[in-house]
């Protein structure tokens, strides 16, 4: 009887550890497609992740914009600054909000990109997107 209890405890601990590591590794999967679209300079695909209204700032210009306006702003930026690479350098977050910082090399310059994503059970939406020139 004592050995059955031990086995049960070990199995429960393994299940908890496995589910915890899965949750940890899955936390930032949302940034994989977002990163891909930034690297490609694909404002159309990236805008599919935008909330209906979001805060977008590109090179110190911007503010609260509709999804359509934000797409046009990024389209303009990507047409003048062709992306060469993008790498997420930092991620953080809570249960329903994820945050990422990344370095974008575009048009021969380096930019810091900040992304806030609201996460719910049925969808993930970018609520804030910012591109700043690195001095």
Regions picked out by a protein language model, each given a short descriptive name:
Residues 42-53:
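Short, well-ordered alpha-helical segments enriched in acidic and aromatic residues
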Residues 110-135:
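Short beta-strand edge/turn micro-motifs at domain boundaries
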Residues 72-110:
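Surface-exposed, charged secondary-structure patches
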Residues 30, 34, 42, 69-74:
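Stable alpha-helical elements in mature extracytoplasmic
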Residues 27, 39, 63-67:
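Solvent-exposed, acidic/flexible segments
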Residues 2-36, 48:
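Short, low-complexity N-terminal intrinsically disordered segments enriched in polar/charged residues
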């Amino acid at each position: 009887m004592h050995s059955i209890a031990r086995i049960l405890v070990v199995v429960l601990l393994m299940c908890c550890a496995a589910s915890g590591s899965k949750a940890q590794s899955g936390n930032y999967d949302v940034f994989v497609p977002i990163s891909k679209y930034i690297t490609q300079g694909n404002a159309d695909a990236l805008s599919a992740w935008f909330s209906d209204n979001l805060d977008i700032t590109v090179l110190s210009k911007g503010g609260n914009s509709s999804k359509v306006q934000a797409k046009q702003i990024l389209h303009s930026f990507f047409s003048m600054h062709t992306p060469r690479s993008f790498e997420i350098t930092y991620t953080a977050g809570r249960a329903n909000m994820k945050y990422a910082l990344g370095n974008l090399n575009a048009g021969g310059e380096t930019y810091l990109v900040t992304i806030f994503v609201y996460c719910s059970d049925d969808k993930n939406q970018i609520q804030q997107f910012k591109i700043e020139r690195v001095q």
